[in-house]
């Protein structure tokens, strides 16, 4: 068989031309390409692929990169090969859908798999996705925080447009950080996103100790978001305050007031801002002055934090989700569902908002993010009150319930919800993966269930510690993570004490 020949012409305005010559079998053509965009610092640099390029060399470079990545991020589950394979899928998607080196972008709700929600950025990234990168990819973690810091001017403008002070982050953020939500009730009332951004930054600083980021925008973000909250709360009789016209993670509650999740995340935001102001006053007086900070202002944040109400049943003392959920119409939740698909496909949104049901974890989500604020009795009561009325109509819900259950000695529930979350997209549990793309936040929360639930990883007074609760049938769980710039290894065995060591 004669070898086919071809000649390649230089690119022109009309394109790249290949001329085939000779006779014989098929010709193998290898075309290499590099991509640069106008957002790159030097978009024309590095376009030459070099004469030694080949498909084989590119493939080997790709394999080498993934081998290194799996060595760093791989999870070993001994006793459940299917779960380990599914978790590798989770890690693959979380890695592939994040532009780790580009702080001008974040991660959309559907990643790169779909244009649902216009590709915009939500609180999903800050609460459900970011912790994976904090512990597994330092560069990606920093880029995600840099994106929020870079969007601070847009957040300040958004607050101004909403007749507020400081910085208010949008519900649906575009590339430049501007609000894209067209629904007045959701976009205007789901203000918890601002506290979520501050919470994520505080979490990032705790895990990484990134002083440079703190002093180059991080502290300012905490300060400006605190200033927003000082202007957002309304005075109440007796010297108290109320958070009016708000909506928590449970989007079925309608417009309410004093959502517990929002209130206590705001309290955390205010405390972080006060700590940041105190640190600037000690270590960066120039920035302290530039931000026009004062001890009086920081004291005002702490005073507001003390006044923020915690809704409770006046007779039992049990925590309430907000000021109105208990007033809604009782209903038997399974009557609204058909399998695991969302009930809003069968019941109109107006109607479902009048039922005493919740769309997704709200109080339970709060208890996984700020667990130290609640007693074991309060957590048990919250599970009794809110788990039975949750419709799990958001893909954010299954994994959060699994995480809560794993952290609070509810093994049956932990394994049941973990199964749904782990295979949500692989098995199309909710029947919308093909139509709407991958659910990145569920993938991130599934990883958190494994790390912070089953492994029980958390930060104690002296650094990382483990309080595991392995699923039945698992013989061992092993993984690596980052803490303060160093790599650590965790090993949890069913028949031995957990082991944690620095590499």
Residue ranges and their predicted role:
Residues 113-121, 167-216, 224-303:
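The feature captures the catalytic groove of carbohydrate-active enzymes
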Residues 88-95, 115-119, 123-134, 191-203, ...:
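Contiguous, well-ordered alpha-helical segments that form the cores/surfaces of helical PPI scaffolds
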Residues 128, 177-180, 235, 252-280, ...:
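C-terminal capping/lid segments that line or modulate ligand- or cofactor-binding pockets
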Residues 98-113, 139-199, 205, 212-214, ...:
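Helix-terminus loop motifs that line ligand-binding clefts
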Residues 89-96, 147-154, 220-232, 268, ...:
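Alpha-helical scaffold segments in carbohydrate-active enzymes
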Residues 69-105, 109, 263, 283-325:
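Gly/Pro-rich turn-and-neighbor structural signature
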């Amino acid at each position: 068989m004669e070898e086919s020949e071809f000649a390649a012409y230089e690119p022109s305005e009309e394109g790249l031309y290949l001329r085939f010559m000779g006779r014989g079998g098929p010709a193998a053509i290898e075309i290499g390409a590099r991509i640069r965009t106008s957002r790159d610092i030097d978009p024309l640099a590095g376009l030459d692929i070099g004469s030694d390029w080949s498909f084989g060399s590119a493939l080997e470079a790709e394999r080498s990169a993934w081998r290194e990545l799996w060595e760093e991020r791989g999870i070993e589950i001994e006793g459940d090969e299917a779960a380990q394979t599914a978790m590798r899928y989770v890690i693959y998607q979380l890695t592939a859908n994040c532009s780790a080196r580009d702080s001008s972008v974040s991660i959309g709700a559907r990643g790169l798999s779909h244009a649902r929600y216009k590709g915009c950025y939500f609180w999903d990234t800050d609460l459900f996705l970011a912790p994976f990168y904090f512990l597994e990819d330092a560069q990606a973690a920093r880029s995600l925080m840099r994106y929020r810091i870079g969007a601070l001017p847009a957040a300040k403008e958004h607050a101004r447009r909403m007749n507020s002070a400081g910085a208010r982050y949008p519900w649906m953020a575009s590339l430049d950080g501007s609000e894209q939500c067209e629904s007045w009730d959701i976009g205007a009332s789901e203000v918890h996103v601002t506290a979520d951004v501050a919470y994520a930054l505080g979490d990032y600083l705790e895990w990484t100790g990134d002083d440079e980021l703190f002093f180059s925008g991080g502290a300012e973000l905490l300060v400006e978001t605190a200033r927003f909250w000082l202007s957002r709360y309304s005075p109440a009789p007796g010297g108290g305050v109320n958070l009016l016209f708000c909506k928590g993670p449970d989007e079925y509650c309608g417009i309410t007031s004093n959502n517990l999740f929002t209130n206590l995340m705001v309290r955390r935001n205010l405390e972080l801002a006060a700590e940041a102001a105190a640190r600037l006053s000690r270590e960066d007086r120039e920035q302290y002055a530039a931000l026009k900070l004062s001890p009086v202002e920081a004291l005002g944040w702490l005073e507001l934090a003390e006044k923020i109400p915690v809704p409770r049943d006046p007779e039992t003392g049990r925590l309430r989700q907000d000021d109105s959920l208990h007033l809604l119409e009782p209903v038997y939740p399974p009557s609204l569902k058909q399998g695991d698909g969302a009930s809003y496909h069968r019941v109109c949104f107006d109607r479902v908002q009048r039922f005493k049901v919740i769309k997704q974890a709200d109080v339970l989500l709060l208890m996984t993010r700020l667990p130290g604020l609640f007693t074991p009795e309060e957590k048990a009561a919250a599970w009794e009150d809110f788990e039975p009325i949750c419709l799990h109509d958001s893909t954010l819900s299954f994994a959060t319930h699994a995480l809560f259950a794993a952290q609070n000695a509810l093994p049956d529930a932990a394994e049941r919800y973990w199964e749904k979350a782990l295979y949500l997209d692989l098995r199309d549990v909710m029947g919308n993966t093909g139509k709407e793309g991958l659910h990145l936040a569920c993938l991130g929360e599934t990883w958190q269930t494994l790390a912070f639930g089953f492994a029980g990883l958390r930060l104690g007074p002296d650094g990382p510690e483990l309080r595991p609760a392995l699923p039945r049938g698992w013989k061992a769980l092993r993984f690596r993570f980052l803490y303060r710039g160093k790599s650590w290894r965790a090993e949890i065995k069913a028949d031995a004490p957990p082991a944690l060591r620095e590499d």
